[in-house]
Amino acid sequence: MKVASGSTATAAAGPSCALKAGKTASGAGEVVRCLSEQSVAISRCAGGAGARLPALLDEQQVNVLLYDMNGCYSRLKELVPTLPQNRKVSKVEILQHVIDYIRDLQLELNSESEVGTPGGRGLPVRAPLSTLNGEISALTAEAACVPADDRILCR
């Protein structure tokens, strides 16, 4: 997906399209884009199956919109774990999996809120990091007593 720098993209897209900096799991900044003015213009375009795009959109602008949409579908394929990775999937199938995944997440959230805490459903309660760090340091101290040849078995 094409990503422009923050200052030029805001100026080019106009005041109605804001850029928001988000954080990915790896910590790298990623630009999250809102709908561009062109896509808003397309969505407002009234008409049925024979409707034409507004005159303000030339072929290059339409190609840019399609490229951005393909990038969005690629991102969805990465984010949704239920999509099959070993074969090519259609855009409709991607959307169906996204909808199902969101529904599953909502059901999971609702079931947690009804029961209370995750530990109340039979799931183990997570230990605090201080407890885990203490256990790790105790294991490290014990490992110092073990001969170096036997330590490899503990990994």
Curated annotation (Swiss-Prot):
GO MF annotation terms: protein dimerization activity; transcription corepressor activity; transcription regulator inhibitor activity
GO biological process, one term: endothelial cell apoptotic process
Subcellular location field: Cytoplasm; Nucleus
Residue numbers covered by motif Nuclear export signal: 98-111
Keyword Transcription regulation: yes
InterPro entries: bHLH_dom, DNA-bd_prot-inh, HLH_DNA-bd_sf
PROSITE patterns for this protein: BHLH (PS50888)
GO cellular component: cytoplasm; nucleoplasm; nucleus
Annotated keywords: Biological rhythms, Cytoplasm, Developmental protein, Nucleus, Repressor, Transcription, Transcription regulation
Subunit comment: Heterodimer with other HLH proteins. Interacts with COPS5, IFI204, GATA4 and NKX2-5. Interacts with CLOCK and BMAL1.
Purpose: Transcriptional regulator (lacking a basic DNA binding domain) which negatively regulates the basic helix-loop-helix (bHLH) transcription factors by forming heterodimers and inhibiting their DNA binding and transcriptional activity. Implicated in regulating a variety of cellular processes, including cellular growth, senescence, differentiation, apoptosis, angiogenesis, and neoplastic transformation. Inhibits skeletal muscle and cardiac myocyte differentiation. Regulates the circadian clock by repressing the transcriptional activator activity of the CLOCK-BMAL1 heterodimer.
PANTHER family: DNA-BINDING PROTEIN INHIBITOR, DNA-BINDING PROTEIN INHIBITOR ID-1
Protein name per its UniProtKB record: DNA-binding protein inhibitor ID-1
Originating organism: Homo sapiens (Human)
Lineage, top ranks: Eukaryota, Metazoa, Chordata, Craniata, Vertebrata
